[in-house]
């Protein structure tokens, strides 16, 4: 180690050869927001210096191209890509992502610590720095049934692992406000670490209380005033632009000369199709520039700001002693990525990675569908013609509205009304064969016939389905059992399309291109059935998440998120 350090210093002083010298670069300096013409010397995976270096074992003339730090995705759930970790890395590295911070509460809610071990092990040899925020909400709440539990003792143990930066998003904000001991125990276990927040709509004294617990970020702002208040109270605002959650346009005015150091770009949840077509965090940077943000500032929000918040020493800048994670592009406004370096090695060029992804999935993660046998009649909503809560989807958002509508009944059973876009929604517990089935109605999917179903249902990932009739819903759920998890579409009792996701019912074992093609086909078929949503399965996956207002459905029933309680229903 001392030998390497001594040699690094010699290279920095110009007394020894660098491993790599990049000539004639226009270096994006994230410290002073300037573009600096310079050469860059790299040794041992680190940047030795920025200046007039020419002596190197390898010399590459960039001919005036821009050189910027590798991008850092400040908050994401890699499982939302539906890709095996090696394929996920293949998708994002080509788009300039050099590091990311992930909260693995998706796979953890199904498989517990074994899921975390799989991701960390599978990513160990990839040219991508993956940092973990220990999942704080496994299970997310008491209002649903998860497949595992991570308690405060587990949090303490996991925080000792390498590349663990802190405690993941505290979604159970009511648990914080009400002082639930198990919630506070996890917060105390992570004292001194980075604590991520999840506080949709919190303001005033409740916001003060939440922040006072030591939680200093939030990625759930959807209104500018909300973001301004949270920033003023000391929070870092993670400006999110994902597949279903698109908040960049609304929140970008928050970024000013006075506030930008407290702002970070994130994607939260991004589908593999969006990763392939538009990119990862680079897509957020690109869109921000198109919306008028200065390119260098946009890069700061996806590099140094993120690194400093998460205390990632050596990440996020092109400067002496920093990791040589770098991007080469010709046009900063377009962020057209030519080359990606990781620790000084060229790992992607012209959109193609230069390494071979290898998948290693434990067999124990390939069998996670444990639904108690049920009949079509078990899906019925019993009741008389009366007012009942109905979930309304808001396009482009994961928050929902609660409607109270009079629903017709036939023979003591409440029925969907396709003409009014009132469809059946069900959630079936899939972890321990409890037989729990949540039933409700939802508005906004637009299906005129058939049903869609998914074993991806944040955050406990039970099976969720929406359809025009119980028979098609039943068939779709049975298809998910057959393929060991995934998504399915059924029309007139026949399986029209399905995408297997056998790894915990969340991830595919297929290459990126095959998964994207399959998803595009099933989404196209959903549109053909009248679905109004651009990402129907991504939207469906959030309808069971009882920590996002206003109304949700879990395997235990309808949840009033604002009151944080189940809504009584007839049985």
Curated annotation (Swiss-Prot):
Which reaction is catalysed here? Answer: adenine + H2O + H(+) = hypoxanthine + NH4(+)
EC number(s) on file: 3.5.4.2
Keyword entries, A-Z:
Hydrolase, Manganese
Its top-level enzyme class, in one word, is hydrolase
Q: Has keyword Manganese?
A: yes
Q: Name one GO biological process term.
A: adenine catabolic process
One of the record's GO molecular function terms: adenine deaminase activity
InterPro entries recorded for this chain? Adenine_deam (IPR006679), Adenine_deam_C (IPR026912), Amidohydro-rel (IPR006680), Metal-dep_hydrolase_composite (IPR011059), Metal_Hydrolase (IPR032466)
Q: Which cofactor does it need?
A: Mn(2+)
Name the domain of life: Bacteria
Disulphide bond pairs: none
Does the keyword field hold Hydrolase? Answer: yes
Instruction: Report the family membership.
Output: Belongs to the metallo-dependent hydrolases superfamily. Adenine deaminase family.
Cited NCBIfam families: ade (TIGR01178)
Q: What is this protein called?
A: Adenine deaminase
Species of origin: Dehalococcoides mccartyi (strain ATCC BAA-2266 / KCTC 15142 / 195) (Dehalococcoides ethenogenes (strain 195))
